């Protein structure tokens, strides 16, 4: 797809500095710039790298700059770059239809222009919304509802009664609605707690590959609107996540935890059961939250157990000083021993 800089600037609401008739057909990353491409560069070093390359033009943020290359200046260059990715590399259009190997249960409702791929199983009573895409080898349980324009990638399993919203993307091998990990030790054995609930995934959620979201013991496990979940995340039974949360890889959230809106979980965070997390909390990588804790709005937490950032940094600095403190104590102990020995000698001389 060839586009002139003039057309690109109109698309991203930017301004061309230089020859706006130049055309480009592709985008390049800053570490592999192709001849004749458009490259997004931020920072002085990257801009110089782009200027010395064979790129046709550079996408940059606003500001005064002299460059030998044509420029497209925009208010938000990364947002513009996303728009250009969609422009130059639009997603492959999938023709609607039901593959002959798919198994469709009784009273299943398929919306307009739905695609059901090879070896998909949809159990009885389920509803698939308009323009949704179910790729190969997916299992949809009984009475599942999936909204419009939702894409389910291969090998996903969605258990009975779950509710998936519109504009949702679920990546490969994720499991929605499996039993929670609930047991109680009775009479010398682990007695399983039945899980009769389901999972609700609200609109505009994206879930990465190999993630598991367990159904509630009773009622619903809820993933709030606009939340984005990375690969390899575990969300336990009866968890309720607010809107627009970010959950990075290897994070585990234990049962009955609730979060507000715009909460960020960095990688490998562990949250115990019955924790309440208010809006706009940030949990740093490898943070561990003990059971029944209440994390306050807008606070950054670090460490294990989780502490507010300032407290955690002071604690870490103190821990790092322990070897020096021990060395000083040892030195002082030796000095005291020498002084005591001298005092003992003087005391004997007086006698």
From Swiss-Prot:
It comes from the Bacteria. The keyword Phosphoprotein does not apply. InterPro entries: Hexapep (IPR001451), Hexapep_transf_CS (IPR018357), LpxD (IPR007691), Trimer_LpxA-like_sf (IPR011004), UDP_GlcNAc_AcTrfase_non-rep (IPR020573). It catalyses: a UDP-3-O-[(3R)-3-hydroxyacyl]-alpha-D-glucosamine + a (3R)-hydroxyacyl-[ACP] = a UDP-2-N,3-O-bis[(3R)-3-hydroxyacyl]-alpha-D-glucosamine + holo-[ACP] + H(+). Transmembrane segments: none annotated. Its EC number is 2.3.1.191. The active site is at residue 237. Keywords: Acyltransferase, Lipid A biosynthesis, Lipid biosynthesis, Lipid metabolism, Repeat, Transferase. GO terms for molecular function: N-acyltransferase activity. One of its GO terms (cellular component) is membrane. One of its GO terms (biological process) is lipid A biosynthetic process. Pathway: Bacterial outer membrane biogenesis; LPS lipid A biosynthesis. Catalyzes the N-acylation of UDP-3-O-acylglucosamine using 3-hydroxyacyl-ACP as the acyl donor. Is involved in the biosynthesis of lipid A, a phosphorylated glycolipid that anchors the lipopolysaccharide to the outer membrane of the cell. Belongs to the transferase hexapeptide repeat family. LpxD subfamily. Homotrimer. This is UDP-3-O-acylglucosamine N-acyltransferase 1. The lineage of its organism: Bacteria, Pseudomonadati, Pseudomonadota, Gammaproteobacteria, Legionellales.
């Amino acid at each position: 797809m060839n586009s002139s800089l003039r057309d690109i600037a109109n698309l991203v609401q930017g301004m061309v500095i230089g020859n706006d008739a130049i055309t480009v057909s592709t985008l390049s990353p800053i570490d592999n710039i192709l001849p004749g491409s458009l490259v997004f560069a931020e920072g002085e070093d990257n801009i110089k790298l782009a200027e010395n390359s064979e790129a046709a033009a550079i996408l940059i943020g606003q500001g005064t700059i002299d460059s030998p290359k044509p420029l497209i200046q925009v208010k938000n260059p990364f947002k513009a770059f996303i728009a250009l990715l969609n422009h130059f590399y639009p997603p492959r259009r999938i023709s609607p239809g039901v593959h002959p190997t798919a198994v469709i249960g009784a009273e299943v409702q398929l919306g307009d222009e739905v695609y059901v791929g090879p070896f998909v199983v949809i159990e009885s009573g389920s509803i698939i919304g308009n323009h949704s895409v179910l790729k190969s080898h997916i299992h949809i349980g009984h009475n599942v509802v999936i909204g419009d324009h939702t894409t389910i990638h291969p090998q996903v399993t969605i258990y009975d009664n779950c509710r998936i919203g519109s504009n949702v993307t679920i990546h490969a091998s994720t499991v929605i609605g499996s039993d929670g990990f609930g047991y109680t030790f009775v009479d010398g054995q682990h007695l399983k707690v039945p899980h009769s609930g389901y999972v609700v995934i609200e609109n505009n959620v994206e879930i990465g590959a190999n993630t598991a979201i367990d159904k509630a013991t009773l009622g619903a496990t809820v993933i709030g609107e606009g939340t984005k979940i990375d690969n390899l995340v575990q969300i336990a039974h009866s968890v309720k996540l607010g809107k627009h949360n970010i959950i990075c890889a290897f994070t585990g959230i234990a049962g009955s935890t609730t979060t507000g809106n715009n909460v960020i979980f960095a990688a490998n965070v562990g949250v115990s059961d019955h924790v309440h997390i208010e809006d706009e909390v940030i949990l740093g990588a490898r943070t561990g939250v003990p059971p029944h804790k209440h994390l306050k709005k807008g606070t950054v937490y670090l460490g294990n157990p989780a502490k507010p950032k300032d407290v955690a940094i002071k604690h870490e600095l103190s821990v790092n000083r322990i070897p020096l403190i021990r060395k000083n104590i040892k030195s002082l102990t030796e000095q005291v021993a020498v002084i005591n020995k001298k005092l003992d000698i003087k005391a004997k001389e007086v006698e």
